[in-house]
Protein backbone atom coordinates (compact mmCIF):
# COMPACT_ATOMS: atom_id res chain seq x y z
CA UNK A 1 0.00 0.00 0.00
CA UNK A 2 3.05 2.27 0.22
CA UNK A 3 2.65 3.47 -3.38
CA UNK A 4 -1.07 4.06 -2.93
CA UNK A 5 -0.50 6.01 0.30
CA UNK A 6 2.10 8.21 -1.39
CA UNK A 7 -0.15 8.81 -4.40
CA UNK A 8 -3.01 9.94 -2.14
CA UNK A 9 -0.80 12.38 -0.25
CA UNK A 10 0.84 13.72 -3.44
CA UNK A 11 -2.64 14.70 -4.60
CA UNK A 12 -2.90 16.98 -1.54
CA UNK A 13 -5.21 14.82 0.55
CA UNK A 14 -4.40 13.96 4.16
CA UNK A 15 -4.26 10.21 4.60
CA UNK A 16 -6.38 8.70 7.36
CA UNK A 17 -5.58 5.13 8.25
CA UNK A 18 -8.33 3.19 10.00
CA UNK A 19 -6.60 0.58 12.11
CA UNK A 20 -8.95 -1.92 13.74
CA UNK A 21 -5.90 -4.16 14.13
CA UNK A 22 -4.69 -1.97 17.01
CA UNK A 23 -7.76 -2.31 19.27
CA UNK A 24 -10.82 -4.10 17.84
CA UNK A 25 -8.85 -7.12 16.68
CA UNK A 26 -7.79 -7.81 20.29
CA UNK A 27 -11.22 -9.24 21.13
CA UNK A 28 -12.17 -10.34 17.64
CA UNK A 29 -9.15 -11.92 15.95
CA UNK A 30 -6.71 -12.38 18.83
CA UNK A 31 -9.04 -13.25 21.70
CA UNK A 32 -7.11 -16.41 22.51
CA UNK A 33 -3.81 -14.50 22.84
CA UNK A 34 -2.61 -12.82 26.02
CA UNK A 35 -2.62 -9.03 26.18
CA UNK A 36 1.18 -9.12 26.10
CA UNK A 37 1.20 -11.19 22.91
CA UNK A 38 -1.42 -8.95 21.33
CA UNK A 39 0.63 -5.85 22.15
CA UNK A 40 3.63 -7.43 20.41
CA UNK A 41 1.46 -8.03 17.35
CA UNK A 42 0.17 -4.44 17.49
CA UNK A 43 3.76 -3.12 17.67
CA UNK A 44 4.70 -5.25 14.65
CA UNK A 45 1.72 -3.90 12.73
CA UNK A 46 2.64 -0.34 13.67
CA UNK A 47 6.25 -0.87 12.63
CA UNK A 48 5.16 -2.14 9.22
CA UNK A 49 2.67 0.72 8.87
CA UNK A 50 5.29 3.32 9.78
CA UNK A 51 7.72 1.81 7.26
CA UNK A 52 5.10 2.11 4.53
CA UNK A 53 4.67 5.79 5.48
CA UNK A 54 8.39 6.57 5.50
CA UNK A 55 8.24 9.07 2.63
CA UNK A 56 5.15 10.91 3.90
CA UNK A 57 5.26 13.97 6.13
CA UNK A 58 3.72 13.37 9.61
CA UNK A 59 1.37 16.34 9.23
CA UNK A 60 -0.33 14.52 6.33
CA UNK A 61 -1.09 11.40 8.40
CA UNK A 62 -4.02 10.54 10.65
CA UNK A 63 -4.60 7.29 12.50
CA UNK A 64 -8.05 6.19 13.64
CA UNK A 65 -8.26 3.47 16.27
CA UNK A 66 -11.44 2.06 17.76
CA UNK A 67 -12.98 -0.97 19.40
CA UNK A 68 -15.83 -1.39 16.94
CA UNK A 69 -18.96 0.59 16.28
CA UNK A 70 -21.48 -1.98 17.45
CA UNK A 71 -24.04 -2.06 20.22
CA UNK A 72 -22.55 -4.61 22.57
CA UNK A 73 -21.09 -4.77 26.06
CA UNK A 74 -17.47 -4.23 24.94
CA UNK A 75 -16.31 -6.05 28.08
CA UNK A 76 -13.38 -7.57 26.21
CA UNK A 77 -12.02 -4.31 24.75
CA UNK A 78 -8.34 -3.83 25.46
CA UNK A 79 -7.90 -0.77 27.69
CA UNK A 80 -6.20 2.19 26.05
CA UNK A 81 -3.44 2.22 28.67
CA UNK A 82 -2.25 -1.14 27.34
CA UNK A 83 -1.94 0.10 23.76
CA UNK A 84 -1.01 3.70 24.58
CA UNK A 85 2.69 3.32 23.70
CA UNK A 86 1.81 1.57 20.44
CA UNK A 87 -0.47 4.46 19.48
CA UNK A 88 2.11 7.07 20.42
CA UNK A 89 4.64 5.34 18.15
CA UNK A 90 2.57 6.20 15.06
CA UNK A 91 4.63 8.31 12.63
CA UNK A 92 1.81 10.71 11.90
CA UNK A 93 0.74 13.72 13.91
CA UNK A 94 -2.98 13.00 14.27
CA UNK A 95 -4.51 10.33 16.51
CA UNK A 96 -8.28 9.77 16.43
CA UNK A 97 -9.84 7.54 19.10
CA UNK A 98 -13.09 6.81 20.90
CA UNK A 99 -13.63 8.63 24.17
CA UNK A 100 -17.38 8.94 24.60
CA UNK A 101 -18.92 5.51 24.69
CA UNK A 102 -19.61 4.10 28.17
CA UNK A 103 -16.72 1.62 28.00
CA UNK A 104 -14.03 4.17 27.12
CA UNK A 105 -15.36 7.50 28.37
CA UNK A 106 -13.18 7.34 31.51
CA UNK A 107 -9.96 6.88 29.55
CA UNK A 108 -9.30 10.62 29.34
CA UNK A 109 -7.75 9.98 32.77
CA UNK A 110 -5.15 7.70 31.15
CA UNK A 111 -4.14 10.49 28.78
CA UNK A 112 -3.84 12.77 31.79
CA UNK A 113 -1.70 10.26 33.71
CA UNK A 114 0.51 9.61 30.69
CA UNK A 115 0.59 13.13 29.22
CA UNK A 116 4.38 13.25 29.53
CA UNK A 117 4.53 10.33 27.07
CA UNK A 118 2.51 12.16 24.42
CA UNK A 119 4.97 13.33 21.73
CA UNK A 120 5.06 17.09 21.15
CA UNK A 121 3.87 16.67 17.54
CA UNK A 122 0.91 14.43 18.43
CA UNK A 123 -2.50 16.01 17.93
CA UNK A 124 -5.22 14.17 19.82
CA UNK A 125 -8.65 13.96 18.23
CA UNK A 126 -10.98 12.33 20.75
CA UNK A 127 -14.37 11.14 19.59
CA UNK A 128 -16.73 13.32 21.61
CA UNK A 129 -20.03 11.80 20.44
CA UNK A 130 -21.16 8.26 21.20
CA UNK A 131 -22.00 6.71 17.84
CA UNK A 132 -23.44 3.55 19.40
CA UNK A 133 -26.33 5.30 21.16
CA UNK A 134 -29.53 6.84 19.86
CA UNK A 135 -29.34 9.50 22.57
CA UNK A 136 -28.26 12.96 21.47
CA UNK A 137 -25.70 14.25 23.94
CA UNK A 138 -26.23 17.72 25.33
CA UNK A 139 -23.86 20.34 23.96
CA UNK A 140 -22.59 21.01 27.51
CA UNK A 141 -21.54 17.37 27.83
CA UNK A 142 -19.73 17.49 24.49
CA UNK A 143 -18.00 20.69 25.62
CA UNK A 144 -16.89 18.99 28.86
CA UNK A 145 -15.43 16.08 26.89
CA UNK A 146 -13.45 18.46 24.68
CA UNK A 147 -12.25 20.51 27.66
CA UNK A 148 -10.90 17.41 29.43
CA UNK A 149 -8.45 16.83 26.59
CA UNK A 150 -7.64 20.52 26.11
CA UNK A 151 -6.71 20.66 29.80
CA UNK A 152 -4.41 17.67 29.33
CA UNK A 153 -2.50 18.78 26.25
CA UNK A 154 -3.08 22.52 26.41
CA UNK A 155 -4.07 22.86 22.76
Predicted regions and their residues:
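Domain-level signal for soluble alpha/beta catalytic cores
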Residues: 1-155
Amino acid sequence: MKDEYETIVRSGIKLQLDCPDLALSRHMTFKSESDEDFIKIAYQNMEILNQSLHNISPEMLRLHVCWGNYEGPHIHDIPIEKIFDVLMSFKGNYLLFESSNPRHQHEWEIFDQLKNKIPENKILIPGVLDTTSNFVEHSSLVKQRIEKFVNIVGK
